[in-house]
Design a protein with these regions (language model features):
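Conserved N-terminal phosphate-binding loop of PLP-dependent enzymes in the Aspartate aminotransferase
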Residues: 1-450
C-alpha cells in the first residue's frame, strides 16, 4: 500500500466530506476558512463533537488531537464551559457590552497572577491581533522601525510577520534570507524585518548587533510551533541581548500559554519577556487574544495619556474582552488549576508519547515525539540507512497520518498533537492501537518497495 492507495481509501471512506467540500468550494475560496485547514484530496467535514471525539459527515469517529489547533484544553463541550456560557448570558443578559464590565478585570488579574512578567493587559479577538498590537507597542516604545523574528516562526496572518513562517532558506548554511509567505505583502515588510536563526545564539547576536539602530522589537515563539524546544540557555541569551541593545522582547505564547505550563513557556524556562501575546486556551474555545507586559510599555495604549491619537498606541475592537470569551476562558483556566489536574494532563501526554515511540520502534522505525508540556509532534524515520534515503520523513509522516485517520485518530495531516483533559485512558488506548496498526501498514509499504 502506497500513499496514493492510502488516499484512495480515504476517498472511499469520506464521500460525504468530499461532497461537502465540492459545495463549499463553490461558496468559499478553496472550500476552507483558513489556508492551513486544507489538505489533499479534501479536508474532513465534521458534523459533531463530544469530549475527545469528532464525528465527520460520513459518521466516522476520531479521537481528536487537533483540538481546534490547540485551543480546547478540556476537549469539546466540557460541562464547565457549557455552564460558563449559560451563566454569563443569564447573568449579564448580553453577549457583548462593548464597554467596560467586571470580567475584564477578573481575567486581567488572573493573567497577571499566572504570568509575573505581565503587569497590565489588553484583550483582542485573536492571537493574530495580539502579536500585531504587541509589535506596535514595542516599536512605539523603542522609536525604531524594524522588527526581528525567527526563521520558521509563525505569529499570525498579518503583514508584519508573514515573513519566513516556513523557514529553511539559508543559502550555503548562512544567515536566513527573508521571503514573503503571501501574495500582496508590500516590500516594506520584507525590508523592515530581520530574520534570525532559532537556537543559534552566535548568529542571532551578530545579526542583532549589526542592526541595533534599526530593530526595536524581537518576537519569538519560545517553543517553535509549540513543539521545537529552545536549546538550553538560548532564551536567556536572547533576553540578555535584547536588554543590552534596547530592544523590546515579545514572547508569542499563543500556542504555549497554559500548555507548556500554566504560566506558559516563560514559567517553564524561567525567562521573562517584556511583552507577551496570548490566545487559544485563554478563550476556552471562543475567540480571544491578549497582550500583556511591563506597565510602562502597556501604558502607551492608555488614552488617558493624551487625546491626540498620534501620541498614543491605538488599540480597539468591538468584541475585545466580551463576556462569552472571558467566561469560558476563566472556566477553562479554573478547571486546569484544580489540584493535580494539569499534572495529570502532563502524565497522560508522556504516556502517549512513550507508547507511540515504542510502537514505531517495534515496527522498525525511528520515532521521536518532540515537544514540551501538553503539545508534541511525531517524527518518523527508518532504521535502515538505505531505506531512509528512499523514504523521506515527510513522506512517512504523510502515510502515517492517512492511516491514522482510517483507524480513528485525527490531528490533521502533518500537524502537531495537542492534549486535553478529556483524553482519558480509553482514548489513549484507542490512539496507541491506531498507531500500532498504522505503523504496521507503513512497514508493509516499505517492505513492498524493497
Amino acid at each position: 500500500m502506497d500513499l496514493d492507495l492510502l488516499r484512495q481509501r480515504y476517498l472511499g471512506e469520506t464521500a460525504a466530506s468530499a461532497r461537502a467540500f465540492r459545495e463549499a468550494a463553490r461558496l468559499i475560496p478553496g472550500g476552507v476558512q483558513g489556508n492551513i485547514k486544507y489538505f489533499d484530496p479534501h479536508p474532513l467535514s465534521f458534523a459533531s463533537a463530544e469530549g475527545s471525539w469528532l464525528t465527520d459527515a460520513d459518521g466516522r469517529r476520531y479521537v481528536d488531537f487537533l483540538l481546534s489547533f490547540g485551543a480546547l484544553a478540556l476537549g469539546h463541550g466540557h460541562e464547565v464551559v457549557r455552564r460558563a456560557i449559560a451563566e454569563a448570558l443569564e447573568g449579564y443578559g448580553t453577549t457583548s457590552f462593548g464597554m467596560p464590565y467586571e470580567l475584564e478585570r477578573v481575567m486581567a488579574r488572573k493573567i497577571s497572577e499566572r504570568f509575573p512578567s505581565i503587569a497590565t493587559v489588553r484583550f483582542t479577538n485573536s492571537g493574530l491581533e495580539a502579536t500585531l498590537l504587541a509589535i506596535r507597542i514595542a516599536l512605539a516604545a523603542s522609536g525604531r522601525t524594524h522588527i526581528a523574528k525567527f526563521d520558521g516562526h509563525y505569529h499570525g496572518g498579518h503583514d508584519r510577520v508573514l515573513v519566513n513562517t516556513t523557514g529553511g532558506r539559508r543559502p550555503g548554511g548562512g544567515d536566513p534570507v527573508a521571503h514573503a509567505d503571501s501574495l500582496g505583502l508590500a516590500a516594506y515588510h520584507l525590508e523592515h524585518t530581520v530574520v534570525l536563526p532559532f537556537n543559534d545564539v552566535e548568529s542571532s547576536s551578530r545579526i542583532l548587533k549589526a542592526r541595533s539602530g534599526e530593530v526595536g522589537a524581537v518576537v519569538v515563539e519560545p517553543v517553535q510551533a509549540g513543539y521545537i524546544e529552545p536549546e538550553p540557555g538560548f532564551l536567556n541569551a536572547v533576553r540578555a541581548l535584547t536588554s543590552d541593545l534596547g530592544m523590546v522582547l515579545i514572547f508569542d505564547e499563543v500556542k504555549t500559554g497554559f500548555r507548556t505550563a500554566l504560566g506558559g513557556a516563560q514559567e517553564y524556562y524561567g525567562v521573562e519577556p517584556d511583552l507577551t501575546a496570548l490566545g487559544k486556551i485563554l478563550g476556552g474555545g471562543l475567540p480571544i487574544g491578549a497582550v500583556g507586559g511591563r506597565g510602562d510599555l502597556m501604558e502607551l495604549c492608555s488614552p488617558a495619556r493624551s487625546r491626540n491619537l498620534a501620541d498614543v498606541v491605538f488599540h480597539s475592537g468591538t468584541f475585545n474582552g466580551n463576556p462569552m470569551s472571558l467566561a469560558t476562558g476563566l472556566a477553562t483556566i479554573g478547571h486546569l488549576e484544580e489540584p493535580g489536574r494539569f499534572d495529570e494532563l502532563l502524565v497522560g501526554t508522556e504516556a502517549l508519547k512513550r507508547g507511540i515511540v515504542a510502537s514505531g520502534r517495534a515496527h522498525g522505525f525511528n520515532v521521536e515525539t518532540p515537544g514540551a508540556g501538553t503539545i508534541f509532534n511525531v517524527a518518523v524515520g527508518l532504521q535502515d540507512e538505505g531505506d531512509a534515503r528512499e523514504f523521506s520523513p515527510q513522506f512517512l509522516r504523510q502515510c502515517l497520518d492517512y492511516s491514522l485517520m482510517h483507524y480513528g485518530v485525527f490531528s490533521k495531516p502533518m500537524n502537531r498533537f495537542s492534549m486535553a483533559t478529556s483524553h482519558r485512558n480509553a482514548e489513549i488506548a484507542h490512539t496507541l492501537s491506531a498507531f500500532d496498526s498504522a505503523f504496521g501498514e507503513l512497514a508493509t509499504l516499505v517492505e513492498g518497495a524493497r
